[in-house]
A protein has these predicted regions:
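Charge-rich, low-complexity N-terminal segments
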Residues: 1-123
Length: 123
């Protein structure tokens, strides 16, 4: 099963720049790998992240979202003190969006890859 997940930062703060952005992507890929999921595509924008993920049928999408948000928040805030200053208690907004995707992933991959055109963020 494939899911398109979107996580927004708390208060929609634009905190993902340069090395924080790259590190967020690395951390999320590692978490998904540890969960046995396939990270098909990821795009970290200044205030949100899009992930296309293949999830085994033994795990629920909400469990994956919860783990990715919880662990990435903890690790990023530990590594980058500036995040604790900008967003005191938690990195992510409490809710997230995730939608099941069929087997034709091309349109979703295109959409995720081209977020910078929509939001003006990095490629």
């Amino acid at each position: 099963m494939y899911d398109h997940m979107i996580f927004h930062t708390k208060y929609n703060r634009k905190v993902f720049q340069n090395n924080i952005r790259k590190r967020c992507e690395e951390i999320m890929k590692n978490i998904l790998d540890d969960l046995g999921c396939e990270c098909v595509e990821i795009n970290v924008q200044p205030n949100h992240v899009h992930i296309l993920v293949g999830i085994p049928l033994t795990i629920t999408p909400s469990h994956v979202a919860m783990k990715v948000k919880r662990i990435s928040s903890w690790l990023l805030r530990r590594e980058f003190a500036v995040l604790k200053q900008q967003i005191p208690k938690a990195l992510w907004a409490p809710s997230c969006t995730h939608q099941s995707v069929g087997n034709d992933l091309t349109k979703v991959i295109y959409y995720i890859r081209n977020q910078y055109k929509k939001h003006g963020g990095p490629k």
